Swiss-Prot record:
One of its GO terms (biological process) is tRNA wobble uridine modification. This is tRNA uridine 5-carboxymethylaminomethyl modification enzyme MnmG. NAD-binding protein involved in the addition of a carboxymethylaminomethyl (cmnm) group at the wobble position (U34) of certain tRNAs, forming tRNA-cmnm(5)s(2)U34. It comes from Bartonella tribocorum (strain CIP 105476 / IBS 506). Its main location: cytoplasm. The gene is mnmG.
Length: 622
């Protein structure tokens, strides 16, 4: 009779991270998947990271997860998004070679101790005394375990839609998990339906690249992993094109044939990744929409047209593609499609991602209502860790909102639930000044060491990095200038008699360690990576105290009542999305408003300020 400590169901991004985390803790772990050869497949866009998402990848890496290292091994166009903005909202991103990414993930898993890969389909759970104690497989029968992690992605009762054609599938070419979906309903788990979509795939050699503008990779690629010294893969460029009036007219003329608009799909799709037909219907006044043509690999003929997700019939897809500059003669290798799938209301989970009604069952990824590789992987790591700790009779791990974006996401899911696919944005975090992508290891690697999921190699690397940073910080805090000395060096400060350290000067706008080294030569010995960390830390030091005060003030304002007469439309700065949700929910207090899906700390501050101003004006008139 087969048995393991932990069973992971599903081999997508959540499942791979869950399996690795569980095994790193020391639990005997089985990863169950339809096809071992498909482990680590990038089912949709060939990219990792981005705004908010890049923070999650850095946090996964700080916890010794796989995604950051795999992305570095496969990255073929690294770009740091929001480079001109502050470090807190910069988002590392890379296009990845699909094959290289998959190979990297599979290599990590096959080399992982305590991990067994099993090729089969789970058709039911074993439940004893209201606790999950294993699974039943389609071919191999019963496997017992101390905990099970479900990471079914879009496979749970998944259906693909292309025009009026519909069939059961987890993704193109792979079967759906239908029996397991039916069994979950029998356990009185609240399920819903969501949908996502993907564009057609095009042949690279049939695109007229010479007519299109190009987007270059960064000259100096910034890796995801704190262990990566250098990006080895050659960096490529992608091209940019646009839809036009002719494209839009073809889509409008055939909108009734779209699965999304014909009534065939009941699940809501991701708001921030709309289909092209959604864009035309909702933003009809636009004369065009930007499309990024992203090659899927160095030696792959496939191109991903980012921005053209659709569920229109294949003949319509071919027609509108021919109207787009550079794509007039493009060959469609695979049509775009929508996929609809079951998800579990995440409000049924604890913050360890365990289902409250079925102890021993953990959920991670799209089954919890999220969208995106990075969101799935982050949940997978946490669920796998907690499943292993449960079996080892250790306390469950909660990650707070003040510690990591992972904590923000899990808290949002569990406390607010979802009505549409959830994706991460930096605006969701109250503590984003301290939750930067550059300091993810400082925040999380010591915790991961306590939890037992960090390798000796990573821990040694982290300690050496911190020692260099501590030494550099100490040097900077012990080099001083008086106001007169500062002026003599061209530094403009108040003549208040206060001596300022090199660390203090780094908080000044446009100040760099390189400039300070002109009159403090000992600073030249600090390596470039430590310089970058120190400069960012010093820049934010002044603001972190204020952030803490703002948070304390916000907590006091939670009990502030929202008048029923409040004109939400009059509050400038609120998105139309939030205005409509607030009007629909009609929250009675700020605490109620906090629970609205998509509500951000910045939006709450706008509402509070508006209410307080209205009260002051009313008091003056009285």
């Amino acid at each position: 009779m087969q048995s393991y400590d932990v069973i992971i169901v599903g081999g997508g991004h959540a499942g791979c991270e869950a399996a690795s985390a569980s095994a790193r803790v020391g639990a005997q772990t089985a990863l169950l998947t339809h096809k071992i050869s498909a482990l680590g497949t990038m089912s949709c866009n060939p990219a990792i990271g981005g705004l908010g998402k890049g923070h999650l990848v850095r946090e996964i890496d700080a916890l010794d997860g796989l995604m950051g290292r795999a992305a570095d091994a496969a990255g073929i166009q690294f770009r740091l998004l929001n480079r001109r903005k502050g470090p807190a909202v910069r988002g590392p991103r890379t296009q990845a070679d699909r094959q290289l990414y998959k190979e990297a993930i599979q290599k990590f898993l096959k080399e992982q101790e305590n991990l067994t890969l099993v090729e089969d389909e789970v058709i039911d759970l074993i439940v004893k005394d209201h606790c999950v104690s294993g699974v039943i497989l389609k071919k191999q029968g019963t496997i017992f375990s101390g905990a099970v992690v479900l990471t079914t992605g879009t496979f749970l009762n998944g259906f693909i839609h292309i025009g009026d054609k519909t069939w059961a599938a987890g993704r193109m070419g792979d079967p759906a998990s239908v029996q397991l979906a039916e069994r979950l309903k029998n356990y009185h788990i609240k399920l819903g339906r969501l949908k996502t979509g993907t564009p057609a795939r095009l042949s690279k050699k049939t695109i007229d690249w010479d007519r299109l503008s190009k987007q270059q990779a960064d000259e100096n690629p910034v890796p995801f992993s704190f262990l990566t010294e250098k990006i080895e893969q050659p960096q490529i460029e992608c091209a940019i094109t646009r839809t036009n009036a002719q494209t839009h007219q073809i889509i409008r003329d055939n909108i009734h044939r779209s699965a999304l608009y014909s009534g065939n799909i009941e699940g809501l799709g991701p708001r921030y990744c709309p289909s092209v037909e959604d864009k035309i219907v909702k933003f009809g006044e636009r004369d065009g929409h930007q499309i990024f043509l992203e090659p899927e690999g160095l030696n792959d003929d496939t191109v991903y047209p980012n921005g053209l997700s659709t569920s229109l019939p294949e003949d319509v897809q071919i027609s509108f593609l021919k109207t787009i500059e550079g794509l007039e003669n493009a060959t469609v290798l695979q049509p775009g499609y929508a996929i609809e799938y079951d998800f579990v209301n995440p409000q049924q989970l604890t913050k360890s991602l365990e289902l409250r009604s079925l102890p021993g069952l953990f959920l991670a990824g799209q089954i919890n209502g999220t969208t995106g590789y990075e969101e799935a992987a982050a949940q997978g790591l946490l669920a796998g860790l907690n499943a292993a700790r449960k079996v080892g009779k250790l306390d469950e791990i909660f990650i707070s909102r003040s510690t990591a974006y992972i904590g923000v996401m899990v808290d949002d899911l569990v406390s607010r639930g979802v009505c549409e696919p959830y994706r991460m944005f930096t605006s969701r975090a109250e503590f984003r000044l301290s939750l930067r992508s550059d300091n993810a290891d400082t925040r999380l690697t010591p915790l991961a060491q306590e939890w037992g999921i960090v390798s000796k190699v990573r821990w040694d690397c982290y300690q050496k990095k911190q020692q260099r940073l501590d030494q550099a910080r100490s040097i900077c805090k012990n080099l001083f200038l008086t106001p007169n000395e500062a002026s003599a060096h061209g530094l403009h400060v108040n003549h208040d008699g206060i001596r300022r350290s090199a660390y203090d000067f780094l908080a000044y706008p446009h100040m760099t360690l390189e400039r300070l080294s002109h009159f403090w030569p000992q600073l030249q010995a600090i390596d470039s990576k430590t310089v970058e960390s120190l400069e960012i830390e010093a820049q934010y030091a002044v603001y972190l105290d204020k952030q803490a005060q703002d948070i304390a003030s916000l907590q006091r304002d939670e009990r502030l009542e929202i008048p029923s007469s409040l004109d939400i439309q009059a509050i400038s700065g609120l998105s139309n999305e939030l205005k409509s949700k607030i009007q629909e929910v009609s929250p009675r207090s700020i605490a109620d408003a906090q629970k609205i899906d998509g509500m951000t700390p910045a939006a709450l501050s706008l509402i509070i300020t508006y209410i307080q101003r209205q009260r002051r004006e009313k008091a003056k008139k009285a």
